[in-house]
Regions:
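N-terminal transmembrane-helix/juxtamembrane module of multi-pass inner/ER membrane proteins
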Residues: 1-87, 265-271
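Hydrophobic core of alpha-helical transmembrane segments in multi-pass integral membrane proteins
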Residues: 26-36, 89-93, 242-256
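Alpha-helical transmembrane segments of multipass membrane proteins
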Residues: 26, 30-34, 38, 118-123, ...
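Membrane-interface loops
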Residues: 45-49, 97-188, 224-271
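Hydrophobic alpha-helical transmembrane segments
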Residues: 21, 25, 78-96, 109, 158-161, 178-183, ...
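Hydrophobic transmembrane alpha-helices
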Residues: 166-171, 210-221
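Helix-loop-helix junctions and helix-breaking kinks within/between transmembrane helices
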Residues: 189-206
Length: 271
């Protein structure tokens, strides 16, 4: 607890935490705006389905196999629902709050920003839909949320970040925390395919994008304005708390939009 308290009183750590929050909120905002700016994106799903390893039999077979092994299904479900945001939160907490590796966190942020930019540009040009959408698998939602859009499939940004995470964590592979995080991240690609959320090609292109971004930015680090460091620690702490609460609200709304809006409406005294 004393270490966590010290980290949360460290302006270097607080500034970087808020930078990660803001980059994530930027991606959420892009997803919301995509409903408007993505109208000209070309749907290449029919052409994509001509490729091998995209058949209904394969997709349904993998999903049914996974469901037929309850421990495996439970493991993959937990790993998958750790989610995009969860995988980011864990590695940021490990690098910043536990290790205070400022250099690694700066490189991680730079890689995330590049991945957001490249993947977002691709989705604006063309997109495909996920296996569970294409084959209308029962038990899956086709609704867009604050965290996901059904067009954001190839390359899989989730798997891009997984590769970035593993590459960034690799120097800590002999530490227990590093081993656990690398193992957890390594399971996520399998979960996305075996649960029908992604095609095999999504994972592979996501990996390639993650490797390309990491190699391109190998010596880069995100630069943060020096003026922010002149803020008082108490001000940085308040901004951090605000961003944390906003992130929690985003997750709650994304999990069950209708229920979340009903709750917020009740709290605000709405009808």
């Amino acid at each position: 607890m004393n270490m966590l308290q010290r980290r949360l009183e460290d302006p270097e750590v607080l500034v970087r935490l808020n930078a990660f929050f803001l980059s994530y909120f930027g991606w959420v905002a892009f997803g919301v705006l995509y409903g408007v700016i993505g109208r000209w994106s070309v749907d290449l799903t029919p052409q994509f389905l001509r490729l091998p390893l995209t058949s209904r039999d394969l997709v349904v077979g993998l999903v049914e196999f996974t469901k037929g092994v309850p421990p495996l299904h439970a493991l993959f479900t937990v790993v998958y629902y750790l989610g995009f945001a969860g995988s980011i939160a864990l590695i940021v907490a490990y690098l910043l709050l536990y290790l205070r590796d400022l250099e690694a966190s700066d490189r991680l942020l730079a890689r995330y920003l590049m991945a957001y930019a490249v993947a977002g540009s691709i989705y604006l040009i063309a997109h495909i839909y996920a296996p569970h959408i294409v084959y209308n698998l029962p038990g899956y939602t086709s609704d867009n949320t604050l965290l996901t859009r059904q067009e954001f499939v190839l390359p899989s940004l989730h798997n891009t970040f997984i590769m970035i995470n593993i590459i960034t964590l690799w120097k800590y592979r002999k530490r227990l925390g590093g081993k656990v995080l690398i193992l957890t991240n390594s399971l996520i690609p399998f979960a996305t395919v075996f649960l029908g959320h992604h095609w095999i090609y999504d994972v592979l292109t996501g990996f390639l994008l993650g490797i390309a971004v990491s190699r391109t930015s190998w010596e880069w680090g995100a630069r943060i304005s020096a003026g922010i460091y002149r803020w008082e620690v108490s001000s940085l702490q308040r901004v951090t708390v605000l961003n944390f609460l906003l992130a929690v609200i985003v997750l709650i709304v994304a999990a069950d939009p209708a229920r979340a809006l009903a709750i917020f409406g009740g709290l605000l005294g709405g009808p």
